[in-house]
């Protein structure tokens, strides 16, 4: 009796895997392009960065790797068990449910704004339920044939496949459902479990199973040590889940759990060294040149080497000292690409290539597959090097007292190069897919085993130990115990510990509850992927505390369902955003971030507005309302930590207006305009509108004070994080840009003494209540205003700039329009206000009297 392979299901899942791979890679390429061309595909919510990023990661995990490994399992089960899968009819039902409901449905829902902000669990709960159902069906489909075998007959690939399916079925709900039931820090503990379990108990067992299977099938030799393979298998399921919390080191999670995760990460590296040694020695004992001759074997060998590299890298970056430096940077993104594209995808490609060579009636192009191998090796290698370099640069800049935008600017060349690498990877994926549909066609024939043949592997000559040959109950029970241990140690324990800590530490009267509008804003923040650029956790590190403020406490997160701590920072952390910037700034920044910061790579959100930043929809207002809840409870109870004072350079360098203009264009032109006239779209949308720097001569004291401390009541932030040389350069530039000029004699409505007295009368009538009798901005009404009225001792307006202000007012400030003033009165009050200026520049006499101060005496 012959045991056939379900070849139609193998083909179906293989083709589905290729479609998923190409689409997922296109999602990723679009995401990469948006880093250096943020306006690319930006006019529709479905194409925003966050949603495409969600579909990229979920597509790689489920559409590509999931289908690839399922196809391989269909091929491998008859060889490993000498039995067919449970039911081909069940297989087709599972195929359509998995691909058309879970994957395609998940992609569609994410793009339409239905998702969850959980790493590697972005598909919404309704799709998560379908995936969990599919995992259960996989256990029925593939697990039953394995369970009918004796433990002593099961090859190590079977152990990995069965263990991966079983423990993924158990772990998947922890990262997808529990964070919705446990808020903030408590939910983060379970999210951390799934972040690592997605790789550790799903991807890794499948990939290693492929490697063990292909090695013995190609070399026709036994593996080096069956004992080592079993030790590596059980250590994997013991240690890997314990790694989860290393994604949240220096957070408010219990330090004991963080230390366990750190230690487990190191032990995981040791386990991988054991597994990789066993795999490589198995190849080394084989016929010379097998790796070079067999292209799928080449993919497998590369996967094994990359498995070692990525695991050692993961162990190193989990060490707390190094983690405090490198976490949240592109180093981590390079690490994840090395894992998912390098280790996992190369293993999947090796497995698919191996089985496709043996499938009847299909085309196979060995040369195209070999070309794809080199395209992928080069593309992946360059990408990992590029992202690693970017991460080191970002981490170094974050440790310095520099504006956040400096790390974005420094990353731009790396991000451009990553897109080039991404094109190489996409080309490699396409060529790999073409190798399955071009070339000569394989002959028709039977694929499978017969009852009188052994599987295409050979048991190790090493004597089997007794505990390896006992019933499934012992070894499987040990695995369940290991899984429960990780669940208790890094899920339940932190949650209970945090619950008790939160009960004790929550201050009385803490403002934690969110309004319906704020909750809706949080939902918008989640579905658009904001948590994948901005973390919501200030870590307990000196660099975080200096830059963002007080570290995030667990009690502050009790209303976050689910938590959105994040694992990457492209933009700054927002955990202390409440009250930091005015609402008008937030709205302009949402509409188009480059209106505020020209070098920003944040996507714009025009669909949240009715054509301009001054016409926000309710969604935009709700999103801003949510941003202003972040850190609100702490801010209301604890005084904000003072920022480090700016230390002025001792020696004043030579004035460098070119350097100052460069700094101005990079940091200030978004609001103030390229000509410093306040006429940018973003600047005119702010309230108060951006200041017309070109229309005023400003004193050095005012410039330096404003750059150092910002302008309270306006969107003008502090720039005391600029390097001292840039700070002085832009200050010098601002001192030079305002050229108020003088009145030509033929432009004067009256002699200067008449202008002075007339202006004094207009000022006393209309301006003194706010600007004060001495025009110092300290009038009885002005002292209650933010921003404070102009202090004319520190600024000299030009006549055209003052005329515009008197005619139109300053929208968003206490300065009203005075449209009834005549041109002569406008000139007179401007002349009078200019007379108070005491900074550098032309001085104007203050007249003590005039022969006539009547306006009718002015021509």
Name the predicted role of every residue range.
Residues 11-36, 49-83, 88-112, 125-145, ...:
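Hydrophobic cores of alpha-helical transmembrane segments in multi-pass integral membrane proteins
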Residues 117-128, 153-157, 186-196, 254-265, ...:
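Non-cytosolic membrane-interface motifs at loop->transmembrane helix junctions
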Residues 30-45, 183:
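Membrane-interface helix-loop junction between the first two transmembrane segments
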Residues 511, 515-518, 543-627, 685-735, ...:
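Extracytoplasmic electron-transfer domains, predominantly the class I c-type cytochrome c fold
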Residues 1-2, 286-290, 445-468:
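Membrane-interfacial, low-structure loops and terminal tails that flank and connect transmembrane helices
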Residues 457-501, 603-657, 662, 674, ...:
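Extended surface/linker regions that mediate inter-domain or inter-protein docking
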């Amino acid at each position: 009796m012959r045991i056939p392979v379900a070849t139609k299901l193998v083909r179906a899942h293989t083709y589905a895997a290729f479609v998923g791979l190409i689409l997922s890679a296109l999602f990723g390429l679009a995401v990469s392009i948006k880093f250096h061309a943020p306006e690319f595909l930006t006019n529709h919510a479905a194409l925003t960065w966050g949603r495409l990023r969600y579909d990229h990661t979920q597509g790689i995990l489920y559409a590509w790797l999931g289908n690839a490994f399922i196809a391989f399992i269909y091929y491998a089960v008859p060889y490993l068990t000498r039995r067919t899968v449970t039911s081909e009819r069940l297989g087709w039902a599972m195929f359509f449910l998995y691909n058309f409901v879970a994957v395609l449905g998940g992609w569609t829902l994410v793009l339409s704004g239905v998702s969850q902000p959980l790493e590697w669990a972005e598909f919404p709960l309704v799709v998560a339920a379908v995936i969990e159902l599919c995992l259960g069906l996989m256990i029925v489909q593939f697990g039953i044939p394995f369970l009918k075998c004796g433990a002593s007959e099961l090859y190590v690939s079977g152990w990995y496949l069965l263990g991966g399916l079983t423990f993924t079925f158990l772990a998947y709900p922890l990262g997808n459902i529990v964070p919705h039931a446990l808020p903030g820090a408590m939910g983060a503990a379970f999210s951390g479990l799934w972040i690592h379990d997605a790789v550790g108990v799903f991807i890794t067992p499948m990939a290693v199973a492929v490697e063990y299977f292909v090695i013995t099938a190609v070399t026709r030799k036994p593996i080096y040590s069956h004992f080592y393979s079993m030790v590596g298998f059980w250590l994997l399921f013991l240690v890997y889940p314990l790694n989860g919390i290393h994604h949240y080191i220096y957070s408010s999670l219990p330090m004991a759990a963080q230390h366990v995760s750190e230690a487990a990460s190191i032990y995981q590296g040791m386990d991988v060294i054991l597994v990789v040694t066993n795999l490589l020695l198995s190849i080394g004992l084989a016929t010379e040149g097998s790796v070079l001759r067999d292209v799928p074997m080449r993919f497998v060998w590369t996967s094994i080497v990359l498995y070692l590299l990525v695991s050692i890298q993961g162990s190193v970056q989990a060490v707390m000292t190094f983690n405090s430096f490198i976490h949240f940077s592109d180093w981590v993104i390079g690490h994840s690409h090395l894992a998912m594209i390098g280790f996992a995808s190369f293993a999947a490609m090796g497995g698919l290539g191996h089985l496709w060579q043996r499938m009847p009636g299909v085309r196979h192009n060995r040369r195209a597959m070999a070309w794809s191998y080199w395209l992928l090796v080069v593309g992946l290698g360059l990408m990992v090097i590029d992202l690693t370099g970017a991460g080191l640069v970002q981490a170094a800049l974050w440790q310095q007292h520099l504006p956040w935008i400096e790390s974005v600017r420094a990353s731009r060349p790396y991000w451009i190069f990553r897109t080039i690498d991404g094109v190489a990877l996409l080309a490699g994926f396409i060529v790999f897919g073409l190798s399955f549909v071009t070339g000569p066609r394989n002959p028709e024939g039977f694929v499978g085993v017969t009852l009188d043949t052994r599987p295409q592997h050979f048991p190790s000559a090493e004597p089997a130990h007794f505990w390896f040959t006992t019933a499934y109950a012992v070894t499987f029970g040990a695995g369940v115990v290991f899984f429960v241990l990780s669940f208790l140690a890094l899920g339940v324990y932190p949650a209970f510990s945090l619950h008790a800590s939160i009960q004790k530490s929550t201050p009385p009267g803490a403002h934690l509850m969110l309004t319906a509008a704020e909750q809706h804003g949080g939902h918008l923040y989640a579905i658009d992927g904001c948590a994948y650029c901005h973390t919501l956790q200030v870590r307990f590190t000196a660099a975080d505390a200096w830059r963002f403020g007080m570290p995030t406490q667990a009690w502050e997160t009790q209303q976050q369902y689910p938590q959105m701590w994040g694992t990457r920072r492209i933009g700054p952390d927002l955990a202390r955003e409440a009250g930091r910037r005015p609402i008008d700034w937030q709205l302009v920044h949402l509409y188009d971030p480059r209106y505020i910061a020209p070098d920003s790579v944040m996507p714009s959100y025009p669909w949240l507005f009715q054509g301009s930043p001054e016409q926000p929809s309710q969604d935009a207002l709700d999103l801003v309302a949510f941003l202003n809840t972040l850190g609100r409870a702490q801010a209301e109870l604890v005084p904000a930590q003072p920022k480090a004072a700016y230390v002025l350079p001792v020696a004043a360098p030579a004035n460098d207006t070119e350097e100052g203009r460069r700094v101005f264009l990079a940091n200030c032109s978004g609001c103030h305009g390229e000509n410093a006239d306040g006429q940018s779209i973003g600047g005119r949308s702010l309230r108060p509108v951006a200041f017309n720097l070109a229309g005023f001569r400003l004193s050095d004291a005012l410039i330096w004070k404003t750059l150092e401390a910002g302008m309270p009541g306006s969107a003008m932030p502090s720039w005391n994080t600029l390097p001292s040389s840039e700070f002085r350069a832009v200050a010098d530039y601002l001192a030079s840009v305002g050229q108020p000029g003088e009145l030509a004699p033929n432009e004067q409505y009256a002699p200067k003494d008449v202008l002075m007295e007339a202006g004094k009368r207009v000022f006393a009538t209309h301006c003194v209540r706010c600007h004060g009798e001495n025009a110092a901005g300290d009038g009885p009404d002005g002292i209650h205003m933010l921003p404070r009225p102009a202090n004319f001792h520190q600024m000299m307006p030009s006549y055209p700039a003052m005329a515009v202000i008197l005619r139109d007012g300053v929208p968003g400030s206490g300065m009203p329009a005075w449209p009834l003033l005549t041109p002569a009165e406008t000139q007179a009050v401007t002349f009078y206000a200019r007379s108070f200026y005491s900074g550098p520049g032309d001085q104007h006499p203050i007249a003590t009297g005039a022969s006539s101060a009547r306006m009718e005496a002015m021509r």
